[in-house]
Design a protein with these regions (language model features):
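Helix-to-loop junction immediately C-terminal to a conserved catalytic motif
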Residues: 45
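Conserved ABC transporter NBD signature motif
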Residues: 53-64, 71-72
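Conserved ABC ATPase "signature" region
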Residues: 109-126
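Hydrophobic anchor residue at the start of the ABC signature
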Residues: 145
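Conserved catalytic motifs of ABC-family nucleotide-binding domains
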Residues: 152
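Catalytic Walker B motif of ABC-type/P-loop ATPase nucleotide-binding domains
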Residues: 156-159
Length: 273
């Protein structure tokens, strides 16, 4: 296990959370606005402390009395919803270097580590001197991920990573997340309400409703739980509603990972529909 919640509550915002984020796997943390998703992630970093229960983060216990979060914050990388809010220097190189220097990374290995972080996310070295504020939305997201990966954390948390991205950038993000998981063996937690995105990558799904665990499934079971998503206040794409209502399509044998674009083509090409 990477992170385990043991009967965790926080004031009246989160109630009796019991859940394990599995090591080396993708987990989607979903729920309507105000359900407690981001607050749950803040507990993993020690930004807020549980008022009841405890959680284990990579073997380190966080409870209401915990004071030292040095190891945890180095091993859990966090990419915020709006990457530009993280940037405050005038070059891509300086952005990545800042976190490394702050964590006392060896200066003689700094350039190599910065280059390695850019390579991991597919950004060219020619971007090193570029102002981060001039990057496209997809490039800013990649840079924010590179900053998080530069310290080689075991866990990466992405907060609403698709919210400002176009379709091309979302496709590139999907491929990057696959690479991070498979090649670098990271545990990835994705906070999102983008159901289309959830369907593109196989993973675990934790649905919160009013601060409580409402659903704990794997992504191949998502179509069987559409009504529960809607009752929790989630917005479900029209194509998913269509699939859910059509017995012919619902009973069709799709792969565990359902790519919406591929599905649309299958629907169009099915002469019996």
């Amino acid at each position: 296990m990477a992170i385990k919640f043991n009967n965790v509550s926080y004031l009246d915002k989160l109630k009796d959370i019991n859940y394990t984020f599995k090591e080396g796997e993708i987990t989607y943390l979903i729920g309507s606005s105000g359900s407690g998703k981001t607050l749950l992630s803040y507990l993993m970093l020690g930004l807020v402390l549980p008022t009841k229960g405890n959680l284990s983060v990579l073997g380190n216990i966080i409870d209401s009395e915990t004071k030292d979060f040095t190891y945890i914050r180095r091993q859990v990388g966090y990419v915020f919803q709006e990457p530009m809010e993280e940037f405050f220097t005038t070059s891509v190189k300086e952005e990545i270097e800042f976190g490394l220097k702050n964590n006392k990374f060896k200066l003689d290995k700094l350039d190599k580590q910065v280059a390695s972080a850019l390579k991991m996310v597919g950004l060219p070295l020619s971007y090193l001197e570029q102002n981060p504020f001039t990057l496209s939305g997809g490039e800013r997201e990649k840079l924010a991920i590179a900053i998080a990966l530069s310290l080689n954390p075991k866990v990466i948390i992405l907060d609403e990573p698709t919210i400002y991205l176009d379709d091309k950038s979302i496709y590139e993000l999907v491929e990057l997340i696959k690479k991070i998981k498979e090649k670098y063996n990271k545990t990835i937690i994705i906070i999102t309400n983008d159901i289309n995105f959830v369907m593109k990558l196989e993973g675990n799904i934790l649905l919160l409703k009013k601060g409580k665990v409402n659903l704990d499934i794997t992504s191949d079971k998502l179509l069987d739980n559409i009504d529960k998503l809607k009752r929790s206040g989630m917005e479900v794409p029209s194509i998913i509603n269509f699939i859910n209502r059509c017995d012919k399509i619902k009973n069709k044998k799709f792969t565990k990972t359902l790519d919406i674009d591929k599905l649309v083509e299958e629907i169009k090409n099915d002469k019996q529909i």
